[in-house]
Structure formats: structure tokens, C-alpha cells
Amino acid sequence: MNNIRKNHPLMKIMNNSFIDLPAPSNISSWWNFGSLLGACLALQIITGLFLAMHYTGDTTTVFSSVAHIWRDVNYGWIIRYLHANGASMFFLCLFIHIGRGLYYGSFTLTGTWNIGIILLFTVMATAFMGYVLPWGQMSFWGATVITNLLSAIPYIGTNLVEWIWGGFSVDKATLTRFFAFHFILPFIIAALVLVHLLFLHETGSNNPLGTSSDSDKIPFHPYYTIKDLLGLLLLILLVMMLVLFSPDLLGDPDNYTPANPLSTPPHIKPEWYFLFAYAILRSIPNKLGGVLALISSILILAIIPTLHMAKQRSMLFRPLSQCLFWTLTADLFVLTWIGGQPVEYPFITIGQAASILYFALILILMPMVSLIENKMLKW
């Protein structure tokens, strides 16, 4: 019998990627976050599309158009809050997904890992530009401060900033181009996700043991489709609780004040998911040094496969490395907290210590401990 699922050109691709895909039999719930990220991306594109239908990218009417979405559009408030809190869930899943990759050694699949880093940068750029669009105080000043960092680049910095702004300050030209880029980037992200999956399916998934699972594979459907569905239901529960009970929990009250170039908010800070990088940026007194540290804090992920000294791929049976991994996690929590605090004693000192620890853990301590573990295991 001619099976359409296995022979139709389009269905065949879907079948080989989501139905008959051979998957390791022992992957845990930490492997759910890839599908959850896909769900978050779909949510963001759909809600974003409906928001764009009612949004105006002009500085004189933009704040009113966002208020109009809340007040006058049918279910506009829930669409807007789903989009705003959906971004938070996106980054939560993203950080856990990266953490799982670090813990279980998935970074040894370098193709998939590198596309993942490009995806991370693209998602961060999209989220930053999206935060500017409501044109509240924090939107305006966040855009001013972050784009201004590019002026630290020698020779071309000032010209580059003015080119991005489309003038001599953040204004109408900046808003319209940010809206255009914010609209197009999620589709570029979706294309990159397909490349990410393409590279992943070339090698197959890693598993908690970090060993080859060629001898023990099971079909993706129904086992992992059901498992992913449970994760999806829990994510929906979490998002809906956030949206319906405390939608402004992760936002900034300053963003309910229309953008005013003549009045600076007391504490300019980005959304919570950028605070760790913002804390690293602020911990260096030099502007160019801060920008380099900011970029390095993300780009450091690219050299992790090179720094992998352990003979075992996963951290599952490496207790010393586990201690350092959870120290790194705690350090990121500290950096996130510091990023939201004012620039004063003792927060400056704590931020500097946490920043040094962040780089020291990844560049020095983790490779050293891996070598010690190799010795202990007589490898």
C-alpha cells in the first residue's frame, strides 16, 4: 500500500523529523525545552501579527495605539500580555535549554551548538527591539542607552550610532526601523530553527549518559510527542497564570509613562532576561571594555566545545564539575539581581565579583576540574 506519510514529498520531511525520527530511549524532561521554544516562537509570531494589525509606528500616536489595543480591541489586553509574558517564557526556556546543553555535553554537536548561539543573538536582538516599540519611558531610554554603547567602537562608533538612529537621537526613524526589524526577525529565527534541527538530525540527539544511543532508539511518536505535550500543557498553565493573575509582574512601571526625552528615569534597566549581561556591562568602568565584556558573556558559549577537557561527555558522573555548574547557575542569579539594582555600594562590588567569577568558572575552573576528574578516574 502506498503510504502517503512516508512517500509524499512534504509529508516525508515531517515524518522523518517528528514521527519516525529515531530518538534515544532515555532522554529526560530536560529535552522538552526544544519543543517548548518552538511553541513560544509560534505564540510570539501569532500574537505579534495581531498586535501589528492595530499598532502604529509613529512617535506621535504610538503610545495611544498601544493603549487602544488594551482598551478598545476585542481581547487586545490578553494578546498584548501574552506577547509580553510569552517573551519572558521564551527566555526562561532558552536559558534552561542552554543549561541542559552545558550540563549534558550537547555542545559537542558543534554544528547544532553554533547555530544555537546565532539563534540566541537573534532572539536577544528581536526582544530588545520589541521592548522599544510601546514607546514608554523605559522603552525610549533603554533604546538610547543600549544603542549608544556602539559609540564605544573606535573611529566608526558615532557614525554607526547615528546611522542606526536615523538621526541625532532616538526618534521616529528609529521607531519605524525597529518595528520593521522586529516584524521580520521572528521569521528569520524560524528559518534558523529549521537549520538547527537539520544539524541535530544529522547526528541524532545526545542523552543524559552522554554515550552513543545508536543501539537503543525508539520512534519519536508517540513516546516523545506525548512527553512534549505534557511540557506544553505545563507551559500554557504557567503563561496563563502569569497573564491572568499578575501580567505586569515582570514589566517595568516606568513603561506606563509615555516616552519623554527631557526626563530620565532614576534607574534605566532592561527586561529581566538581559539583566545578567547588563550587570557584566556595568561592572567595568571603561565603556569599550564594558561592551566587549557584554558581547563576550554570550560569545563565550562558542569556545565551550574547545574548553571541554573531560573524557566523559556528560556531567552526570562528574560531581566536581556539577558543583561548578550549579555555582555558575547561582552566579547568574546574582548577576540578574545586581543588574536590577542602582549603581552604588555594595552593588558595584558584588557585580564585579560575580562578573569575574562568571568568566573564571567557564574559562579556568571548569577545564581544570575536568582534568582533575580525569586523573581521579585514571584516564
From Swiss-Prot:
Record has Mitochondrion as a keyword: yes
Topological relation to the membrane, as annotated: Multi-pass membrane protein
Record has Electron transport as a keyword: yes
InterPro entries: Cyt_b/b6_C, Cyt_b/b6_C_sf, Cyt_b/b6_N, Cytb/b6-like_sf, Cytochrome_b, Cytochrome_b_C_euk/bac, Cytochrome_b_N_euk/bac, Di-haem_cyt_TM
Cofactor dependency: heme b
Positions with a binding annotation for a ubiquinone: H201
Cofactor info, note text: Binds 2 heme b groups non-covalently.
Gene Ontology molecular-function annotations: metal ion binding; ubiquinol-cytochrome-c reductase activity
Intracellular or extracellular location(s): Mitochondrion inner membrane
UniProt binding sites for heme b b566: H97, H196
Alphabetical keyword list: Electron transport, Heme, Iron, Membrane, Metal-binding, Mitochondrion, Mitochondrion inner membrane, Respiratory chain, Transmembrane, Transmembrane helix, Transport, Ubiquinone
Protein's GO biological process: mitochondrial electron transport, ubiquinol to cytochrome c
Transmembrane stretches, start-end: 33-53, 77-98, 113-133, 178-198, 226-246, 288-308, 320-340, 347-367
Amino-acid positions noted as binding heme b b562 in the UniProt annotation, renumbered to this chain: H83, H182
GO-annotated cellular components: mitochondrial inner membrane; respiratory chain complex III
Annotated signal sequence range: none
Additional detail: Heme 1 (or BL or b562) is low-potential and absorbs at about 562 nm, and heme 2 (or BH or b566) is high-potential and absorbs at about 566 nm.
Function: Component of the ubiquinol-cytochrome c reductase complex (complex III or cytochrome b-c1 complex) that is part of the mitochondrial respiratory chain. The b-c1 complex mediates electron transfer from ubiquinol to cytochrome c. Contributes to the generation of a proton gradient across the mitochondrial membrane that is then used for ATP synthesis.
Oligomeric and partner information: The cytochrome bc1 complex contains 11 subunits: 3 respiratory subunits (MT-CYB, CYC1 and UQCRFS1), 2 core proteins (UQCRC1 and UQCRC2) and 6 low-molecular weight proteins (UQCRH/QCR6, UQCRB/QCR7, UQCRQ/QCR8, UQCR10/QCR9, UQCR11/QCR10 and a cleavage product of UQCRFS1). This cytochrome bc1 complex then forms a dimer.
Family: Belongs to the cytochrome b family.
Name assigned to this protein: Cytochrome b
Gene: MT-CYB
